[in-house]
């Protein structure tokens, strides 16, 4: 099943997210800050990221901006999971490239449903971006053909 990264400094919330995702069949990796996340992104890109805004050392919105600016991670689906609940905060997160926004406290069933829905949409889009015929693969996103 898909690997999901959780970027959350609150141990209790991270534990709830991890438990819910693992019980839904996902593999989970956890990070307390952006520096740890970026180190891991160098070697493995996840299927989805759950990202808090209020993190130590680096704001989640800055992390979001950096993820979207990197061609290797630009299309990774990101759900902001944060205590910032104002309409302005939500609009800012979505405008910077978040795919969804969940306010804390959140319902675990809603979180899992949003993860599933986002993965369903993005997985289909990724599959459509690659076309194969025999031993030929055309990657429309990379404008490349592989034999």
Model-derived regions, located:
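Basic, amphipathic DNA-recognition helix from helix-turn-helix-like DNA-binding domains
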Residues: 65-70, 75-132
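Active-site T/S-Asp motif of two-component receiver
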Residues: 9, 51-52, 81
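Short, Lys/Arg-enriched segments at the junction into DNA-binding effector domains
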Residues: 2-3, 117-147
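Conserved sequence signature across two-component system core domains
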Residues: 7-8, 31, 49, 102
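Acidic, metal-coordinating helix/loop segments flanking the phosphotransfer/catalytic sites
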Residues: 30-48
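Two-component/phosphorelay signaling modules centered on CheY-like receiver
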Residues: 10-29, 39
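Hydrophobic residue at a beta-alpha junction
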Residues: 32, 55-58, 67, 88
